[in-house]
Amino acid sequence: MAFSAPSLSKFSLLVAISASALLCCAFARDFSIVGYTPEHLTNTDKLLELFESWMSEHSKAYKSVEEKVHRFEVFRENLMHIDQRNNEINSYWLGLNEFADLTHEEFKGRYLGLAKPQFSRKRQPSANFRYRDITDLPKSVDWRKKGAVAPVKDQGQCGSCWAFSTVAAVEGINQITTGNLSSLSEQELIDCDTTFNSGCNGGLMDYAFQYIISTGGLHKEDDYPYLMEEGICQEQKEDVERVTISGYEDVPENDDESLVKALAHQPVSVAIEASGRDFQFYKGGVFNGKCGTDLDHGVAAVGYGSSKGSDYVIVKNSWGPRWGEKGFIRMKRNTGKPEGLCGINKMASYPTKTK
C-alpha cells in the first residue's frame, strides 16, 4: 500500500528543520536500494532524518532556512510519488537520488538538452547501413564487458547530453578498432562544435560526428577536461594526440532489428524522450514506463539482452554513476511500436573507423 505524507505547517517545518540541522547531520547511513522505508513516510522525525542524511550523501547545502524548507517539501512530494509508483509497477523500481529536491519542471530544464529545432534534418538512406544484411546475431551483447565503455560521466546542469552520447560512441568504436579505451573530451564539442550545435543549450550527435571528421579528431578528456559549462574553444592544441573516426552512418529509422544489428557490432548514439517523471528517479530493473517520442535527451546504447522474458537495450546515461543502475538503464525493446520505447529507434547513429 502507499502511505500518506506527514502533515506539517510551514512554521512547524521551519522549527523542525532548524533543529534537525543540528541533530541529524551525522545520520548518514546505508539505505535499501530505493533509499527509504515505510517508516519514513509516516513519521515526521524519521522523514527529517532521511532528508538530512540524503543531503549529506549528496553534498547538498541551501542558502537559507526558507530555501531548505522549500526543498524539503519538494523532497517529500517526490518521495510520495516514488512510493506510489513502486506500488504500481513491477518490472522496474524508483528510488531517491540526487534529483530528489528538484521539481519535475526544474529537472527537465537542467538535465535534458537535445536540439529540437534540428529534428527535420535529412537522415542518410538505409542503403548506407553497413549491418543491413547481418542475420546471425548473438542473444545478448554488453560492450561494458568487452572493455569498450568508459566510466559513466556527469554532464551536470549543462544541456550537453548530445556531446556525451557522441563521445561514448566514438570511445567505443575506437576501442573496438585499436584495442585502446580512451576517455575523450565532451568539452571540446561544447566549446568548438558551434556551427550547428549549441553547447549547453543542446545539439545533435550527427553534427558532432561531422565536426570530429572535419577537424581531424577529438582530444582526450585529460587534455581537454569537462567544465560543466561552455568555455572558449581550444581546438588547436599542438603535439596532443587526437582520436579519429572515418565517418558515421544512421541506423534505419523506426527499426528495432536494425538497432540491434548495429549494437551487436558497436555502441550506438541514440536519442530518447527522458522527460517522464519515472525516468528522473529510475533506480533499476527493465524500464517500460510511460514516455512519448518527443526526443529530448541524447544517450548511448551499449548492448542488449533479456531478463525474465523481457528484452531490453542497455543505455549509458550522463547523469553520474549514482543514477539508475550505476549510471545505466535497461530499456524494454520489442514493444510492438516501430519507434521503440521513448523513441529510441527514431534517431540512432554510429561512427565508423578503419583500422
From Swiss-Prot:
GO MF term list: cysteine-type peptidase activity
Group of enzyme by EC: hydrolase
Propeptide: 29-136
Gene Ontology biological-process annotations: programmed cell death involved in cell development; proteolysis
SMART domains (UniProt xref): Inhibitor_I29, Pept_C1
Active-site residues per Swiss-Prot or TrEMBL entry: 161, 297, 317
Keywords linked to the UniProt accession: Autocatalytic cleavage, Cell membrane, Disulfide bond, Glycoprotein, Hydrolase, Membrane, Protease, Signal, Thiol protease, Vacuole, Zymogen
Compartment(s): Vacuole; Cell membrane
Catalytic activity, EC: 3.4.22.-
Disulfide bonds: 158-200, 192-233, 291-342
Residue ranges that the Swiss-Prot or TrEMBL entry lists as coiled coil: none
PTM comment text: Autocleaves.
Glycosylation sites: 180
InterPro entries, alphabetized: Papain-like_cys_pep_sf (IPR038765), Pept_cys_AS (IPR000169), Pept_his_AS (IPR025660), Peptidase_C1A (IPR013128), Peptidase_C1A_C (IPR000668), Peptidase_C1A_papain-like (IPR039417), Prot_inhib_I29 (IPR013201)
A GO-annotated cellular component: nucleus
Primary location: other
Tissue-level expression: Mostly expressed in roots, stems and flowers. Confined to tracheary elements, and specifically to xylem.
Function: Cysteine protease involved in xylem tracheary element (TE) autolysis during xylogenesis in roots. Participates in micro autolysis within the intact central vacuole before mega autolysis is initiated by tonoplast implosion.
Family listed: Belongs to the peptidase C1 family.
Name of protein: Cysteine protease XCP1
UniProt source species: Arabidopsis thaliana
Encoding gene per record: XCP1
